[in-house]
Curated annotation (Swiss-Prot):
Binding site for Mg(2+) 1: 362, 467-468
EC number of the protein: 2.7.7.-
Co-factor requirement: Mg(2+)
Lineage of producing organism: Eukaryota, Fungi, Dikarya, Ascomycota, Saccharomycotina
UniProt-recorded name of the protein: DNA repair protein REV1
């Protein structure tokens, strides 16, 4: 009774239930409960069933299958008891007050319809074990049916816009509210939201509605979106989802944030004169507003402006949908994959013996041009050639993705904030901000590449980006290459692309090397072409470019070149001042040679790989996501969930390209100590310190459990507090194609237990396929006796499942002998055998076995270091390799030199050198043995030779040479023996 006493009523109705039960086994109930919970987790958790099963070890998987099959048997043949309940007529004060009647209300009629539809199954329910989980599951199912009936009843009276106001919102109402609970329930359901009658887990709810909260509830709901009922009322009235922050009950306003004193709220909704609802009535329900009172709203814009918290399951989807860089990287990767999979076999392979011309083609401010051509009617008055135009998400602190050349003439650049760009414009000039049109960007890019293929004048088309390509044309030996021919080709290409993209212009750089084609492209912009070959290079050409116009020259390299060569202003100045040796000394050998060749108009070997072996250069080598906006976590649990979602997203992409990964990398951006908690850019990253950590997985894999667990472990090794985290990147490196031989390195140990066919057939149908697939993945075959590894069928690869002593298996002769004994003696013998067996199974037997293993280990260690079968390379001293003979030699050496003025200096150096070699090969224990030997000899001869100079010399050698050597290498000795010591005489 105690387990069901706290159940929450779904519709404030009275439940009468009676339990007819026998006394069940408590342990059995607990085990069944745990299996049910794990089954529920596998079905409805954050991971799918396959991911859940893959995280289990072999033994855990078998135990889970056996318990689940046993639970399923018990549920199909109940013995513990049954629960019978009946639902009375629904009537409450709030229902009459808000809707004007009991059974005529839409919710009451919905419940009655559900009861009538379920009346035929009452006999089945009486004979079923009714658990707490089943009760809440049926409640949730009944709620879903009730809400669907309500929506179907008024679907013709609700506009498509207002029916999506609360899309993706899961709302729970806490306590008394005005309007009432049922009225708010109607508003939520009829306008696209989901209503929760009970709060089983706060993770499932997005908003909590309450009129007032006590202190305890305020603390409990401090990290959740708790709003007043006016938020629902005003959102329905405005026909759009209003910011919940304006209606928050728990959040405290920032000191710098102004309070909204003049915020207009609505306490009630204007209702029709008739509130009773009949099937034939034309009036709308109390949760609906007349259509003419609803202001039109663009749902696309509403969704675009919706901000999703980083702990929301839809955060990654929302983030990538609005990320320009994500679209760029995805399109670029798709272009390269398409080139490798479809077009590479169609192109001519280029060699170093071919004569070719490079056409480097690039759009002029691609995003700004496409956004202008596809602009809405509200921007129809702007002129692309006269007005400064930028493409961005919003205003103020939004980053500028692209700008036209008019805006660039005022100093505006890509990546600049809109507010900063507006300050650079003179008075009277207004900056025009156009939104992203990702679909049009992709269409224009596809038209660009299809036009290049249709021209059929190139032997190779290499995709660099969605708006940039390198095209190669091989010149036959019998055709003379002229600038006139190349100029005609450039004009033809530009004209065809302009027509194919409906108004987008491109610039072309034409040359006989990649680096010169790139520089010529820079000179040709905007909307032009330039033809420059190695044979006609001039000082005027080199004077047109800055140092960072060369490929591979960034900010760091630029500063080194300026400091080394007296701040050259152009490439022509650098060509006059540099020498190859000075260049290599400044920026390194490899980069120095690359810059040297570029200044001669030539390509280095690494750059030429894209022409000679494009498959190797363009194939995907890594897969990653990088989130640096909206990252605000409260605890480690949220971070773990976010990492799991990121890994799941990357694994889906990894499986799409049919690859596995053998190395993963986690990169973090942690807020700087002196940086503000909230940066100027809303939900931005601000000033951060970057950290990264990589891990090798051993063998390539695409298992979620392995990768997600390792990623979370990497996060803990970096030690970043969740509240200080501002950016997070997950990366899969060393991608490998999935093949049949990938599992050759996997080692599968046999199960300690087995699953019988009977137990397997008793499993629930919804998980039987997943478990069977998991067994197939682990290379196990189902046999009549159970599940065993097919690796056991091979004697060469067989493993000993358990080590059985001979005495554990009674022979037939022993049984016959026991049967011939008298009854009393036979009983005594059996009793003694049982005692002996118990002794063997006690801790005493384990202790004796442990002592025996330790002695064997010490003997193996001795043989390992000093025996004839030692794996170490022998270290000689005086042409002796056996340590025992070396000890005898040292002992004799000490004894003979004590009374003779001590050892010779060169002999001491040779001896110390021998000791150092022992330490370097991790044989410090041998050095310790020699030091003890010398110390022991000195102690024995102290009475006779303590006044001799030889005795003092050996003491000095021991104190100044041998003991310090031991202390410097004591960590090796401590690591093996777990000791903490200092060596002293």
């Amino acid at each position: 009774m105690g387990e069901h006493g706290g159940l929450v009523d779904l519709l404030d109705s009275d439940l009468e239930y009676s339990i007819n039960r026998e006394t069940p086994d408590k342990n059995n109930c607990l085990s069944q409960q745990s299996v049910n919970d794990s089954h529920l987790t596998a079905k409805t958790g954050g991971l799918n069933a396959r991911s859940f099963l893959s995280t289990l070890s072999d033994d855990s998987l078998i135990e889970y299958v056996n318990q689940l099959s046993q639970t399923n048997k018990n549920n199909s043949n109940p013995t513990a008891g049954t629960l019978r309940f009946t639902t009375k007529n629904i009537s409450c004060d709030e229902l009459h007050a808000d809707l004007g009647g009991g059974e005529d209300s839409p919710i009451a009629r919905s419940v009655i319809e559900i009861q009538e539809s379920d009346s035929n199954g009452d006999d089945v329910k009486k004979n079923t074990v009714y658990t707490r989980e089943a009760y809440f599951h049926e409640k949730a199912h009944g709620q879903t049916l009730q809400d669907q009936i309500l929506k179907d009843q008024y679907k013709d009276q609700i506009s498509s816009q207002s029916s999506k106001i609360f899309k993706n919102c899961v709302i729970y109402i806490n306590g008394y509210t005005k309007p009432g609970r049922l009225q708010l329930h109607e508003m939520i359901v009829l306008h696209g939201g989901k209503f929760l009658h009970y709060l089983s887990s706060k993770k499932t709810v997005t908003h909590i509605v309450a009129s007032n909260l006590p202190l305890k509830k305020r603390i409990e709901f401090a990290n959740y979106k708790v709003v007043s009922p006016d938020w629902i009322v005003d959102s329905v009235k405005e026909a759009r989802l209003l910011p919940w922050q304006n209606y928050s009950l728990t959040s405290k306003l920032d000191e710098q944030q102004k309070k909204l004193d003049n915020c207009k709220t609505v306490n009630s909704i204007p209702l029709p004169s008739e509130t009773s609802l009949h099937k034939g009535s034309k009036c709308v329900g109390s949760a609906l507003l007349p259509v003419e009172q609803q202001s039109p709203v663009n749902l696309n814009n509403l969704e675009a402006k919706r901000i999703v918290a980083c702990d929301d399951p839809d955060f990654l989807t929302s983030y990538f949908a609005h990320s320009r860089l994500h679209h760029l990287s995805a399109w670029k990767a798709n272009l390269k994959d398409k080139f490798l999979n479809e077009n590479i076999h169609k192109y001519t392979k280029i060699t170093d013996k071919d004569t070719y011309i490079i056409f480097h083609i690039d759009f002029d401010c691609f995003f700004a041009t496409v956004a202008y051509l596809c602009r809405s009617s509200s921007f129809s008055a702007c002129d692309f050639k006269r007005d400064p135009i930028v493409v961005c998400h919003g205003t103020k602190n939004s980053d500028i993705a692209s700008c036209n050349y008019v805006a660039r003439s005022y100093g505006i650049k890509n990546g600049m904030w809109v507010s900063q760009a507006e300050k650079m414009l003179p008075n009277g000039i207004k900056l025009i901000s156009l939104p992203y049109t990702f679909e049009q960007f992709q269409l224009k890019s596809e038209a660009f590449y299809s036009t290049l293929k249709r021209l059929n004048i190139f032997n190779l088309i290499l995709p660099i980006s969605i708006d940039e390509a390198v095209c190669v044309r091989i010149i036959p030996d019998n055709i003379h290459n002229t600038n006139t021919l190349n100029a005609r080709l450039c004009e033809e290409i530009r004209q065809e692309i302009f027509q194919g993209t409906n108004g987008c212009t491109v610039s072309i750089g034409c040359s006989d090397s990649l680096v010169l084609a790139r520089l010529a492209l820079k000179m040709a912009k905007p909307n032009g072409y330039n033809i420059t070959f190695k044979s006609n290079l001039s000082e005027e050409f080199w004077s047109s470019f800055k140092l960072d116009d060369l490929p591979g020259v960034g900010h760091s390299t630029l500063s080194r070149l300026e400091s080394t060569f007296d701040s050259p202003h152009s490439l022509n100045d650098l060509r006059k001042r540099y020498t190859l040796d000075a260049l290599k000394a400044s920026v390194g050998s490899k980069l120095g040679m690359k810059i040297h060749l570029a200044l001669q108009g030539q390509d280095d070997e690494e750059s030429l790989k894209i022409l000679y072996d494009p498959k190797e250069v363009l194939q995907r080598k890594s897969l990653s996501i990088d989130i640096n906006w909206g990252i605000r976590f409260k605890n480690i649990t949220q971070v773990d969930l976010f990492i799991e979602r990121g890994c799941q997203y990357l694994l889906e992409k990894l499986n799409e390209i049919n690859k596995t990964t053998s190395q993963i990398t986690l990169k973090l951006m942690r807020r700087c100590k002196d940086a503000p908690i909230e940066p100027p850019k809303y939900m931005g990253m601000g000033r951060c310190d970057s950290f990264s950590r990589s891990s090798r997985l051993g063998i390539p894999t695409n298992e979620f459990g392995i990768i997600a667990t390792e990623m979370k472990s990497l996060y803990r090794t970096l030690g970043c507090p969740p509240m200080e985290l501002r950016g997070l990147a997950l990366q899969f490196n060393k991608l490998v194609d999935v093949g049949p031989d990938n599992n050759q390195l996997k080692l599968r140990l046999p199960f300690k237990t087995i699953v019988t066919n009977r137990a397997f057939e008793a499993l629930p149908e919804d998980v039987k396929n997943d478990i069977n697939n998991e067994f197939e993945k682990r290379n196990y075959k189902r046999k009549e006796s159970g599940l065993t590894s097919n690796s056991l069928s091979s004697k060469k690869k067989g493993f000993a499942i358990s080590r059985l002593e001979v005495n554990d298996l009674p022979s037939t002769m022993e049984e016959q002998f026991m049967n011939e004994l008298p009854t009393q003696i036979r009983a005594e013998v059996r009793h003694d055998l049982r005692i002996q067996k118990k002794i063997q199974q006690t801790k005493l037997g384990n202790l004796q076995e442990k002592i025996k293993r330790r002695e064997e280990s010490l003997q193996n260690e001795k043989n390992h270091f000093m025996g004839q079968n030692s794996i170490f390379q022998p270290i000689k001293f005086q042409n002796l390799t056996r340590f025992k003979k070396i000890c005898q030699l040292v002992k004799q050496w000490v004894a003979e030199t004590l009374g003779d003025g001590g050892p010779h200096e060169k002999d001491v150096k040779l001896f110390v050198k021998y000791l150092i070699k022992l330490c370097d090969s991790n044989r410090v224990h041998l050095v310790l043995h020699l030091s003890n030997l010398i110390s022991r000899e000195l102690n024995l001869c102290a009475f006779l030779n303590q006044d001799h100079s030889g005795f003092q010399t050996w003491e000095r050698i021991l104190l100044n040479d041998i003991i310090p050597l031991l202390n410097r290498n004591k960590h090796t000795y401590q690591t093996v023996r777990k000791l903490d010591m200092d060596f002293e005489v």
